[in-house]
Design a protein with these regions (language model features):
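Signature of the SF2 helicase/ATPase Hel1-core->accessory helical subdomain module
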Residues: 343, 348-355, 359, 365-491, ...
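Metal-dependent nuclease catalytic cores that hydrolyze phosphodiester bonds in DNA/RNA
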Residues: 1-78, 82, 108
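A substrate-engagement module of RecA-like helicase motors
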Residues: 178, 185, 246-361, 369, ...
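Walker A/P-loop NTP-binding motif
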Residues: 232-245
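Conserved small/polar residues in nucleotide/adenosyl-binding loops
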Residues: 643-647
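A contiguous, basic/glycine-rich beta-loop/short-helix subdomain that forms a polymer-engagement track
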Residues: 341-356, 372-378, 510-623, 632-636
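Conserved pre-motif I regulatory segment
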Residues: 176-221
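Mg2+/Mn2+-dependent nuclease catalytic core
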Residues: 57-154
Length: 647
C-alpha cells in the first residue's frame, strides 16, 4: 500500500479553501507574524495549557496510507473536565465581521487534530475551540463546538477520501519520475574536465543526507572554475540521487535571473536528450515582476474588487492544477503567465501552488533564506529537500541584507506632508515617531559631533539643532563607537522602536481605506519600511548591531546583521543536503564560518584551462567605477576587441 506524507494544514486548505486572494486580510503582517501572537496567548493561558502539541497518525483511505502530521496550537482540560483543542488564528477582519462560520478551514484543522488526539487518548468526546485574535483592537473572540470521537473520525475519513484522487496522482507521478530519473543519462557525449569530479561530490552529498554527525543535513562547498558547466554538474547528480530515493524535491537557488535561466536551459537539455523524461519544474519569480493586473503605480493590487486574477482564485485553482499536471511541464515565467491568463488565476500564487507538485523549484535565494518570504509550505518544517545554491559567494552579503533593516526619518516627515492638513490617528502616530527620531538625531550629534576639519562641519542643519542650553530628550546608551555623527549601539533604543511600531496599525487602516489615493504607493513603502524594522527588532540578538547616522536633517536607523551564520544554518537544516558552489569560494574557512556550515566538506577543483592561455592586461586610463561605467562602455568594448582579435 502506497504511503503519502501530508501536513494537516495542507490537507484542509487544499480541499476547503474558497474565495479570493485579499491582501487586506493576508498580505500585511502588523502583528509581526502570527507565531508572536500565538506565543502571547499560549503564555497567558496558564500552566495547564499545552502549547504547540505535535500530533501524527497513519490513516488508510482508498488503499492509500496517509501519514498526517501537524501541531495543535493548544490542548487543555477545562473546568468541567473536558479536553479542548484550541486553534488560534490572528486576523485583520473587523471584529463585527468575525463569525463562527467565517472560515471552514479553521474548524477543519481543529477537528482533524481532535480526531487524532481523541483516538490516541481514547476520549469519547472533546471540544474544539477557535480563538480569533483581532490584531487592530487586540480583541479575542472565541467559539466552541463539542464533537464525539465518531463524528471526528467520520469527518477525517471524508477529507481523506476527497483527497485520495490527488494523492493517487502524486503516487503515480512519483513512480514514473523515479523510474525516469533512474534511467537518466548525462546529456553530453562526455564530461568536460572537472565536471565528473564536481558531479561526484554533489551526488555523494545528496545520498548522505542527514546523519548522526550531520543532523542538519550534509553540506558541501564546491569551488569550480568558470566554464566547466557547473549548472549541469550540479543538477544531473542531484536528480540521479532523487531517482534512487535520496530526496523528494530539488530547490535550485540563485542570486540572479541569468543563473535561473541557466538552470532552465539545463533542464531543457535533459528533456531534449531524453524526451520521455518525467520531470516537472517551476521557476518562481517576484510578484511585482509577474503581476498581470498592477495598479496605476505598477504595484500588484491583490484585492478581489480590483484584480480579476485574485477574485475567486481559490475557487478555480484546482481546475487549473488538474489541467496543468496532466503532462510533464516546465513552468517558467512565460508559461505561468500563459496558464494564469487561461484559467484566470494569479500567476504568482499559481507558481507557489504548482511548486508542491513539481520536482524542481528554481528561484531566488530569498525563497529559502529570507525570514519574510521563504516558502513556509516547505520550510516551516524539515523535509527531504535537496538544495543547490548557485553563485554561493553572493550569499553572505545577501543573507546579511535579508536579516538587516534600514529606516530613514525623512520618510515620516514626507508622509505627514503627503497626508495634508487635518487630524487623524495616523498623523498623530507619525508625529510621535518623527519626534522620537528627531530626539535621537540630536543625541547622535551630541555623542558624535562632526570633526571641525571636515568640509561639511559647519552644516547649519547640524549646528543649529543643539543650542548651548539644550540637551536632547532621548538619552542613548553607551555606544560601541561614536564619531562623525555616526553611533553604533549594542542594542536598538526602545524609545525609537516603540513609536515606530505604533505607526503600523493606523497606517494599515489608512492603506486599506484609501486604495486609490494618489499617495498610496508612498505610504505603502513607508509601511513596509516600518515593518522591516519591527521584524528585525524581533529577531535582534548578539549577531546584530545598531547604527544611527545623522546627516543634515536626516537620521538613518539601521539594525545590521553582522553574522548571518545561525540563520543560514537553520534554513539549510530544513533540507536533506545542501551543495553551495561558485567559481570563487576562497578561503573556504571564511564561507563555512559565515554561512553556518563549520563542519561542511569543502573542495576546490583545479582549472582545466592551460595557464599559458591567461592574458592579464592593465588599462589604467579606463575607469570601471560604477558612476563611470556608462561612459566607459565603448572604451572597454574597443579594448576587448583589440586584445582578442587575431594579430
Amino acid at each position: 500500500m502506497a504511503t503519502v506524507h501530508l501536513p494537516i494544514r495542507q490537507l484542509v486548505e487544499f480541499l476547503l479553501r474558497t474565495g479570493s486572494i485579499d491582501s487586506r486580510f493576508t498580505g500585511f503582517d502588523r502583528a509581526l507574524e502570527g507565531a508572536h501572537i500565538h506565543r502571547k496567548l499560549q503564555k497567558a493561558a496558564g500552566d495547564g495549557y499545552q502549547a504547540e502539541v505535535f500530533l501524527s497518525v497513519e490513516r488508510q483511505a482508498e488503499d492509500i496510507t496517509f501519514t498526517l502530521e501537524g501541531r495543535a496550537d493548544g490542548i487543555f482540560t477545562d473546568e468541567t473536565g473536558t479536553v479542548v483543542i484550541d486553534e488560534i488564528k490572528t486576523t485583520a477582519v473587523p471584529p463585527e465581521e468575525i463569525t463562527e462560520d467565517m472560515n471552514p478551514c479553521h474548524w477543519a484543522q481543529g477537528m482533524v487534530y481532535g480526531a487524532i488526539y481523541a483516538a490516541q487518548q481514547s476520549l469519547p468526546e472533546l471540544n474544539v475551540r477557535l480563538t480569533y485574535y483581532q490584531i487592530d483592537t487586540d480583541q479575542i473572540i472565541r467559539f466552541i463546538r463539542r464533537f464525539t470521537q465518531q463524528e471526528l473520525d467520520e469527518f477525517l475519513d471524508k477529507l481523506l477520501c476527497q483527497y485520495a484522487p490527488w494523492a493517487q496522482r502524486r503516487i503515480e507521478w512519483d513512480v514514473k519520475r523515479t523510474q525516469s530519473l533512474a534511467a537518466l543519462q548525462f546529456p553530453f557525449a562526455q564530461y568536460r574536465p572537472g565536471q565528473r569530479a564536481m558531479a561526484g561530490e554533489i551526488y555523494r552529498a545528496c545520498r548522505a543526507g542527514k546523519t548522526a554527525d550531520c543532523k542538519g543535513g550534509t553540506r558541501l562547498f564546491c569551488q569550480a572554475p568558470t566554464g566547466i558547466g557547473k549548472t549541469m554538474s550540479a543538477l544531473f547528480p542531484a536528480l540521479k540521487a532523487m531517482g534512487e530515493g535520496n530526496g523528494e524535491k530539488l530547490f535550485y537557488l540563485t542570486a540572479r535571473n541569468t543563473t535561473q535561466t541557466a538552470a532552465e536551459d539545463a533542464l531543457t537539455r535533459l528533456h531534449t536528450a531524453q524526451p520521455e523524461l518525467a520531470l516537472r519544474s517551476v521557476t518562481l519569480t517576484a510578484k511585482e515582476k509577474v503581476c498581470l493586473h498592477p495598479d496605476a503605480e505598477g504595484h500588484p493590487a491583490c484585492l478581489p474588487e480590483l484584480c480579476p486574477y485574485a477574485n475567486g482564485y481559490y475557487d478555480r485553482i484546482k481546475d487549473a492544477l488538474t489541467a496543468l499536471l496532466d503532462g510533464t511541464g516546465s513552468f517558467d515565467r512565460a508559461a505561468l503567465a500563459g496558464a494564469a491568463k487561461r484559467f484566470s488565476v494569479c500567476p504568482f500564487e499559481l507558481g507557489l501552488d504548482l511548486s508542491e507538485w513539481c520536482d524542481v523549484v528554481i528561484g531566488d535565494y530569498n525563497y529559502l533564506f529570507d525570514p519574510v518570504v521563504h516558502l513556509k509550505r516547505f520550510f516551516d518544517s524539515s523535509g527531504e529537500w535537496l538544495f543547490l545554491v548557485d553563485e554561493a559567494h553572493n550569499l553572505p552579503d545577501r543573507a546579511r541584507a535579508m536579516y538587516s533593516a534600514r529606516f530613514c526619518k525623512s520618510s515620516l516627515t514626507e508622509a505627514k506632508r503627503a497626508l495634508g492638513k487635518g487630524k487623524s490617528a495616523l498623523k498623530t502616530a507619525l508625529t510621535k515617531a518623527d519626534k522620537a527620531l528627531l530626539e535621537a538625531r540630536k543625541a547622535c550629534i551630541q555623542l558624535a559631533p562632526r570633526h571641525s576639519s571636515q568640509t561639511d562641519a559647519a552644516d547649519p542643519a547640524q549646528t543649529s539643532l543643539l543650542p548651548e542650553n539644550t540637551a536632547p530628550a532621548l538619552e542613548l546608551p553607551e555606544p560601541l563607537y561614536a564619531q562623525d555623527s555616526t553611533v553604533f549601539l549594542q542594542e536598538p533604543p526602545s524609545a525609537l522602536l516603540s513609536p515606530l511600531r505604533a505607526v503600523q496599525a493606523p497606517l494599515q487602516d489608512w492603506l486599506e481605506a484609501n486604495p486609490d489615493a494618489e499617495v498610496h504607493a508612498q505610504l505603502l513603502e513607508l509601511y513596509f519600511a516600518v515593518q522591516d524594522i519591527a521584524r528585525a527588532a524581533e529577531r535582534y540578538d548578539s549577531h546584530f548591531v545598531t547604527q544611527l547616522t545623522a546627516r543634515g536633517r536626516e537620521l538613518e536607523l539601521q539594525l545590521l546583521c553582522l553574522d548571518p551564520a545561525p540563520f543560514v544554518d537553520a534554513s539549510l537544516a530544513a533540507g536533506r543536503s545542501a551543495a553551495l558552489f561558485s567559481a570563487t569560494l576562497a578561503p573556504p574557512s571564511f564561507y563555512r564560518s559565515v554561512l553556518g556550515c563549520s563542519d561542511a566538506r569543502a573542495v576546490a577543483l583545479d582549472s582545466p584551462f592551460p595557464a599559458e592561455n591567461l592574458g592579464l592586461y592593465c588599462l589604467p586610463n579606463i575607469s570601471t567605477r560604477y558612476r563611470d561605467r556608462e561612459a566607459s562602455v565603448q572604451a572597454v568594448s574597443d579594448a576587448c576587441l583589440l586584445y582578442t582579435s587575431p594579430s
